[in-house]
């Protein structure tokens, strides 16, 4: 990893030894669980705590978080005898999953694909697979049969998920299949949990690990299969520190371990499709949804011909569809990939715009918490009552919509509907994700307004209408993957509709209904869309046909960053079939108080870009206050 991504070896080693206490001796902690006793004094908070804790066990702080009460409430339940403590060995083995606990009933297509994965797992040889199935086709059930085979062979399994929030719903599905939960690995774990997982994985006693991209670097004793779920997701690319792509590192690790690697996706990346065309990956297709469920019908709403009312963002046709859906007692999802209430706040008296002092980015209004926040560095200020430039009061205006604004509009249009917002601001932990799922399943939510977080992995049979508020949002900026990402994102969110026996409908609001990506979504012709995108990449020698590498120079001293970037550019080697562009100010010219300049290396696939850059930069020196970062195969061009 360090060699391919030109990352410091120490940084990669830090990821591998991610639990600082893992090499220490044995430890115990005290965890608490319900006794079944009813406390003499039952308050509303105590009742809520006992109900939400159920049969869970954990530290006082963990149980308080689960129950959404204070630590004092939990301590009171302990004193009242409703909760009891027990010493837990931090290194106690995890219960082993049973591969034959509850085998699923598979369709013919699923059984065929599962059989191939089981055979590949039994041979214990490296082979990469693309499990390409439409949303709702049952990809999870298929790759879990590969996991079951690894368990029968006495080996370990790793399943990577793109979001921490997906972990809790997945754990429930896994428990239903194997009788126990897998070992979870993500940034939300406390140090003691990380230590236990790390040690049990290294000993080979933790059989199945489900986690975020960092789970790739854990010390498995004998991996039998690796699965990358939602493998197209850009969140698998790490943008800070070591700039690695978990999808590609998973394939690399599978090669080292001698085990199959499954990339599961309803909308595979062009790079993955290209590997199938070259014969390097084997494709397994699931062309239809499981059971009686059908793919939803997708229709575009031309916002030029059918615009929303003034001051609103939901077009009349979508309003009518929401009304009809709610009247049938069904659920609605409104999708807008923009957190907060509005992306820009300005003064209508003097024109002042609120910009982050640390980044070249606007401050986003979050009306729920009455704050303006930068989504790049996290800088937060209270929403002011007056303009800081001209002191005018009541002159600040919110420009553009975010999910909070759409939720307000939905509430105004349908006052009897129960509206919920789902973003990383509201679903910040697996426990919060589980709470959201429970509310949806209990019909306690009528309209969900969410960002890309709701496009991944959720299954709600009563959700039959999806409205995409702004399909053009992701097409801005000139990114070479913009159209592909838009197609993937909308297809994924469309896949939330009609997953049960009730048919689903998707309405896509756009100012460009004739755009190739919108036409492909409406027609369902993914193959033609991907063929055109692939040909455009081929003509431009862009990935997967060519290579990119970004060199980002940054410093708190703008002149020092600029001078270093120019020095690097002047020293660029002359290599046939390789071009160096820049330096130029990065689109995000300042980030976290550091001024940024970018160079872009473009080469054919025959060029060993890593060797060229290693020799090039290795011969140079720059001031200590300047950082030079290399991003091989970049996904983010900011």
Can you say where each PLM-predicted feature lies in the sequence?
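Accessory, non-ATPase domains that flank or precede helicase/AAA+ motor cores in DNA-metabolism machines
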Residues: 1-265, 272, 277-293, 326-327, ...
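Accessory helical-bundle/CTD segments and flexible terminal tails appended to RecA-like ATPase motors
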Residues: 14, 18-40, 299, 304, ...
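Conserved RecA-like helicase motor-core motifs
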Residues: 156-158, 178-189, 355-358, 364-367, ...
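Conserved two-lobed SF2 helicase motor
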Residues: 199-221, 434-457
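Conserved strand-helix element at the start of the C-terminal RecA-like helicase core
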Residues: 140, 155-170, 322-348, 396-407, ...
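Flexible beta-alpha connector loops of hexameric P-loop NTPases
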Residues: 182-191, 233-244, 304-312, 395-399, ...
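Cys/His-rich Zn2+-binding cysteine-cluster or related metal-binding knuckle/ribbon modules and their
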Residues: 191-192, 203-206, 240, 245, ...
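Conserved nucleotide-binding/hydrolysis modules and their immediate coupling elements
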Residues: 57-60, 65, 361, 371-376, ...
